[in-house]
Amino acid sequence: MGKRYQNHDDLEEINVEIEVQGLASISKNIKESVVGLTLPQVRYLVDAYYQMQGARMAMENQARSLIQGYDSTVDGAKDAHPLAIQWTSKAFRNDEGQIQKMLDKYTDSIPMGRYLKSIKGIGPVLAAGLLAYLNIDKANHANQFISYAGLNDNNNPWLGRDGSAKLIKELKTMFPDENPKNLSDDVFIEICRRTHRSFESVRLYSQVREEKTNERKGYTTWDSLQSYLAMPPYNKDLKTLCYKIGESFKMVSGRESSLYGKLYRQRKAYETIKNDNLEYADQAAAILKKKNIGKGTDAYKAYSKGKLPKAHIQARAQRATVKIFLHHVFDAMYFEKYHIDPPTPYVLEYMGHEDMIYPEVDYKEFF
């Protein structure tokens, strides 16, 4: 049996080992190097952080199953893990921390990064992710940010393999005289009408690609169009990041000084009332019909009563809050680039009336 964690001295031993063998601290040169990172490089670090975090959490869950009742927070806990296993966990956490420090340095070097980190619930990793994925040069209004983040699924749903195949079959019937090796703009226009995608995006991203170079060839076939339509019409990584932002706003919802935490609470209460009044009964019935939900689950009990489960209501509240936040992020990026206010102030039809919702922090102080 390996040596077990007994006292503070043993914990110090683990920390010393990490100092010697792990990435206990990164040098000043490494920290400074992040200032000039490209956006793809920032995305790499953000992805690396979350991949490392996911691996560490899976590893810790597996370690907990080795001994029952393990609690690493209790000094002198009985039946604790051997030092070797504790060292591994702390080394993983340490590596996460080093990436976080680098992203903190990176976001400190950018006014928009400093603005984002001034918002409660947004730390250096989330801020860096937003900077890496959102490009004001490619957006004319906030809804484009929201769509790119996959938060407008009702307007532009992910068709998937089956949905795209069905749509292509319908289009072939509608346009029987089309050249199958070079589709016309008429097909693209119909795609835009049905999916709410932009004409430029459909025509560009549906083109056949060169196998070796992956370069676009300038024409679209039925097969290349179907492949394009089968892909998510949003950035999956950004959507995941926005989910994490929503979770973070939920965690700070107890702070009165947190605007987005407060909006989350209000929206959750609003959604709960609508749910209790069975205003989502049609959605509940549709989900129950479409998905194979275990009859013994709380979700099934809710759907069968014409209601959405609590987790679903919570997710709706988080998405609504993140949408408001993304509007504010767009406004801030627009002001930073053009030094004027966005053309149309964001007015939200919210809680049954229209309110102007101002950002938690005045972004003009940072630019």
PLM feature spans:
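Long, charge-rich intrinsically disordered scaffolds of nucleic-acid metabolism proteins
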Residues: 2-108
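Long, contiguous secondary-structure blocks with strong helical propensity
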Residues: 71, 75, 105-114, 164-170, ...
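Short, Lys/Arg-enriched phosphate-binding patches
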Residues: 116-121, 133-134
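Cytochrome P450 catalytic-core helices
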Residues: 129-130
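Catalytic Zn2+-binding segment of zinc metalloproteases
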Residues: 134-141, 152-153
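A basic, often C-terminal nucleic-acid-binding module that engages the phosphate backbone, implemented
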Residues: 156-367
